[in-house]
Regions:
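N-terminal beta1-alpha1 ligand-phosphate binding loop
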Residues: 11
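Conserved core of the sugar-phosphate nucleotidyltransferase
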Residues: 121-149
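Conserved N-terminal catalytic core of the sugar/cofactor nucleotidyltransferase
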Residues: 2-5, 15-20, 28-114, 118-120, ...
Length: 149
């Protein structure tokens, strides 16, 4: 499954913890057995635990690339926006990146979601496999090109 995670915003809603320099998705606020993890670490972990073969690409601004690599490692796919232009241009650029750089075909399903949702593990355990089956059924029947959840 091809997944685009949107992580381009400045994320000031957790002010004073977050600001233009330190976006909310990188603040380690979720307690784990090993310490704390950030929103981006949590959603990435949840996706890869449920679907180890998921191809995850993070759409982000150039100011956040080092934070993403610092928290997720250098092997995660990153599509860098030259400047922040809001959600639709970020999705358009990321899908062009999937097509041109990663070789994703125009008929392959792509899931787009933000990096800052709060999803319990039990929701991930059933949601991602259902979404995978659902997208494959659309892909096999060619019913639609996109969906929003």
């Amino acid at each position: 499954m091809n997944i685009i995670l949107l992580s381009g915003g400045s994320g000031k809603r957790l002010w004073p913890l977050s600001n233009d320099i330190r976006s909310k998705q990188f603040i380690k606020i979720f307690k784990t057995a090993d310490g704390y993890e950030s929103m981006v670490q949590r959603v990435y972990r949840q996706i890869t635990e449920v679907d180890k073969d998921a191809s995850v690409t993070i759409a982000t601004s150039k100011t956040q690339v080092s934070a993403i690599h610092n928290q997720l490692g250098d092997s995660v796919g990153v599509c860098v926006e030259p400047c922040r232009r809001d959600t639709f241009p970020a999705i358009a650029l990321a899908t062009a990146y999937l097509h041109d750089v990663k070789g994703v075909g125009p008929d392959e399903p792509v899931v787009v979601c933000p990096v800052d949702p709060y999803v319990n593990k039990c929701n991930c355990d059933w949601l991602l496999p259902c979404l995978h089956r659902w997208l494959n059924s659309f892909y096999n029947n060619r019913c639609t090109k996109y969906c929003t959840i």
